[in-house]
A protein has these predicted regions:
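Flexible "cap/lid" subdomain of the alpha/beta-hydrolase fold that forms the substrate-access gate
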Residues: 49-51, 60, 109-145, 149-330
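N-terminal secretory signal peptides
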Residues: 1-16
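N-terminal export leaders
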Residues: 16-25
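A short loop-to-beta-strand scaffold at the N-terminal edge of the catalytic core in hydrolase folds
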Residues: 58-67
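Conserved Rossmann-like nucleotide-binding pocket used by diverse enzymes
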Residues: 76, 102, 145, 169, ...
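Catalytic active-site module of serine/aspartate enzymes centered on a nucleophile-bearing elbow/loop
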Residues: 329-364
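Conserved HGGG/HGGXW glycine-rich cap/lid loop of the alpha/beta-hydrolase fold
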Residues: 67-111
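Boundary at the C-terminal end of the N-terminal hydrophobic targeting segment
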Residues: 38-40
């Protein structure tokens, strides 16, 4: 396969919308249970036509699922703090290209089940959720798309079940093969236990720190993006530049009001305990993942990340370096003026590359 999709793309810096995000407003109603094939224009879809919503019992929980289009299956996995709504632009592009876009609210988020036990949020559970979802929909295999924690779980799903997941397209979080020492232990030994953001995210009081969704949801969207000033932008190693600070004003124009309002309402309703459990499960999973030490992802893959993403402090990788763990990496893009929210800050680039990738690995 050709690797000419690699490179750097410059995205114009976004303007600030004059429409201030209205953090107040009514909460969305309970999720609708829909038979597959029924048409829906619910609060979860923002009134987008052609969207279907339904609930699926899988792996001991209920996943709320959004779907659009017909054709080869493409399974989207979101991160923190997010819901399946984050993928609406990509789902539309994929469906228009002749694919079946399927996006669950990941366990702990949105209208899916949210177990309280943090040990139930490792890739062992989430990969089981995804396999069970494919089984329920009678889909033998799918292409995976992931962002943030969703990218982590997508990479792990490809590692564990190459028979069910035949290609991987990830945003923001690269695949890093398991080493001998966890990142948590490295931070302790280097004296950074009070600095590294994942320790704060794992603490019991993190639920309360994040609880005010009308403040924290717009805050993380702004501070983790390429729109924030470089010297104040989120840093995973500086508590003074945290993710949960209030945004200084109206969000940039790329943060669509319907999307922001949906996530604010959902997290104000559910709280953040389930979503934060992914951080609490991360260190225990390192020790559970010993059987996959040295394993590589062999499926065709593609990776996009923003040059202004704070995660690059933790993962300063090049595409060539990533190939040591993902030898079938077709290529990757680093986007100028883009931070962590790649699918929102640069949707046209992401959509174009995603459709090209799908047409390469699973033509319609």
């Amino acid at each position: 396969m050709e690797s000419n999709l690699s490179g750097t793309v410059s995205i114009p810096a976004p303007s600030i919308s004059r429409r201030a995000f209205l953090a107040s407003g009514t909460a969305f109603g309970a999720s609708l249970l829909l038979e597959r094939g029924a048409q829906a224009q619910s609060p979860g879809t923002g009134g987008v036509s052609g969207i279907k919503e339904y609930d699926v019992n899988t792996n001991g929980i209920i996943l709320h699922v959004t779907e659009q289009g017909d054709g080869p299956a493409v399974l989207f996995c979101h991160g923190f703090p997010d819901t399946s709504y984050t993928w609406r632009q990509q789902m539309k592009a994929v469906a228009s290209a002749g694919y079946r876009a399927i996006a669950p609210d990941m366990r702990g988020c949105g209208r899916s089940s949210a177990p309280t036990d943090p040990t139930l949020y490792t890739p062992l559970q989430t990969v089981g959720d995804l396999v069970g979802l494919l089984d329920a929909l009678k889909i033998p295999s799918a292409v995976l798309v992931g962002h943030d924690w969703g990218a982590t779980h997508v990479w792990q799903a490809a590692l564990m079940r190459p028979d069910r997941f035949k290609a991987v397209f990830c945003l923001s979080v690269p695949f890093v093969p398991r080493g001998d020492v966890s990142v948590f232990e490295k931070m302790r030994k280097s004296g950074h236990q009070e600095d590294f953001y994942m320790f704060e995210q794992s603490r019991p009081d993190a639920d309360q720190i994040w609880a005010d969704a009308p403040v924290t949801i717009p805050g993380i969207l702004y501070w983790a993006s390429g729109s924030a000033p470089a010297d104040k932008r989120w840093s995973p190693m500086d508590p003074a530049r945290s993710l949960h600070r209030a945004a200084p004003g109206p969000l940039p124009s790329w943060a669509e009001p319907d999307y922001v309002a949906h996530n604010v309402a959902e997290f104000q309703r559910t709280g953040f305990h389930g979503a934060l459990n992914y951080y609490r499960a991360a260190e225990p999973y390192f020790y559970l993942s010993a059987p996959w030490k040295g394993a590589r992802i062999t499926q065709p893959s593609f990776f996009i990340w923003g040059k202004a993403d704070g995660l690059k402090e933790l993962y300063p990788l090049t595409v060539d370096q990533m190939r040591s763990g993902v030898p079938s990496l077709i290529g990757g893009l680093e986007l100028d003026n883009v931070g962590h929210w790649v699918q929102h800050e640069a949707p046209d680039v992401v959509n174009e590359q995603l459709v090209k990738f799908l047409q390469t690995v699973t033509p319609t």
